[in-house]
């Protein structure tokens, strides 16, 4: 029999009060604080993302693992600790039990954040971009655990599509195969992170948050349903031309192969190359995408929690 203290949830008082009153709450990952941006930009962005959720009327809940405890919502001091502590583990669904057992610190990805959000009773999650099938994934089988986790939780994911470095066509095919409902907000194109279009059409378009909220309600009532992925493109003024990004990515892939860069290092290599090719615009766009998706997630959660 499982002991209750095996999963020590520490829920921030603001988040706890919101959940108890059935108010809208949006979960956020902590991986962007530890692995996405440098200090102090990581703290500034984390606080800006939380502020964006609050602007919508919802309550933010940044999730992370701290000394073996599951934090659901963080104080400023905890965000600072995540931002400045070196060597914090990147935690996905597969290594989450080990990080908890070792009572260490861990920054949650999309997959683990969804698992812990559901554990806490949170129904919405915001991320800049989901993981997916990597380029060459048909041979390497390098597929993000995000896609599998969508089938195991029913927490709605609001994002700006999938990350640019992925094989987005195969990612969409994989989501369809796994019965994951995908909808785009006010666009026919499936977005790609800080690019407003990935070059692939959306499986489904809806133009109002009310319509999306109704679809979420129905999806959650269906037996065996997966999480719904809601993709909202970044604002035009924050977007980067997809042609520039794709050219930089292709050049980086060829350069990585020539230098013998393999495994998880390839992603870091490509992202750094894109940042250099865009003269730092990609890093700024990354932060803007995070803020925009967080605000839309908050708005959607507020609409969902309205009496209908």
From Swiss-Prot:
Binds 1 Mn(2+) ion per subunit. GO terms for cellular component: cytoplasm. It comes from the Bacteria. The keyword Metal-binding applies. Its EC number is 4.2.1.70. The keyword Manganese applies. Signal peptide: none annotated. It is an enzyme of class 4 (lyase). GO terms for biological process: nucleobase catabolic process. Substrate binds at residues 90, 110, 144-146. Its cofactor is Mn(2+). Pfam families: Indigoidine_A. The active site is at residues 29, 163. Mn(2+) binds at residue 142. PANTHER family: CARBOHYDRATE KINASE PFKB DOMAIN-CONTAINING PROTEIN, ZGC:136858. Catalyzes the reversible cleavage of pseudouridine 5'-phosphate (PsiMP) to ribose 5-phosphate and uracil. Functions biologically in the cleavage direction, as part of a pseudouridine degradation pathway. Belongs to the pseudouridine-5'-phosphate glycosidase family. This is Pseudouridine-5'-phosphate glycosidase. It comes from Serratia proteamaculans (strain 568). The gene is psuG.
């Amino acid at each position: 029999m499982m002991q209750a203290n095996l999963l020590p949830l520490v829920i921030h008082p603001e988040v706890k009060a919101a959940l108890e009153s059935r108010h809208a709450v949006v979960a956020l990952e902590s991986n962007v604080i530890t692995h996405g941006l440098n200090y102090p930009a990581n703290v500034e962005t984390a606080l800006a993302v939380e502020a964006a959720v609050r602007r919508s009327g919802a309550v933010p809940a940044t999730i992370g693992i701290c000394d073996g405890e599951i934090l659901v919502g963080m104080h400023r001091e905890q965000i600072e600790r995540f931002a400045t502590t070196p060597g914090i583990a990147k935690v996905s669904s597969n290594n989450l039990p080990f990080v908890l057992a070792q009572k260490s610190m861990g920054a949650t990805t999309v997959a683990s954040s969804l698992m812990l959000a559901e554990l806490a009773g949170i129904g919405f999650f915001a991320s800049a971009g989901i993981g997916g099938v990597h380029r060459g994934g048909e041979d390497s089988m390098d597929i993000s655990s995000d896609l599998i986790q969508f089938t195991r939780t029913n927490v709605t994911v609001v994002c700006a599509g999938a990350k640019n470095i992925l094989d987005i066509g195969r990612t969409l095919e994989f989501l369809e195969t796994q019965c994951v409902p995908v909808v785009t907000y006010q666009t026919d194109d499936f977005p790609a992170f800080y690019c407003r279009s990935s070059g692939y059409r959306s499986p489904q378009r809806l133009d109002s948050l009310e319509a999306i909220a109704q679809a979420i309600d129905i999806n959650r009532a269906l037996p065996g349903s997966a999480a719904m992925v809601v993709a909202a493109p970044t604002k035009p003024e924050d977007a980067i031309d997809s042609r520039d990004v794709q050219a930089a990515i292709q050049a980086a892939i060829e350069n990585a192969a020539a230098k013998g860069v393999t495994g998880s290092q390839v992603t870091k290599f490509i992202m750094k190359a894109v940042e250099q090719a865009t003269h730092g615009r990609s890093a700024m766009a990354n932060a803007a995408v995070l803020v925009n998706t967080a605000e839309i997630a908050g708005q959607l959660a507020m609409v969902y929690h309205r009496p209908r």
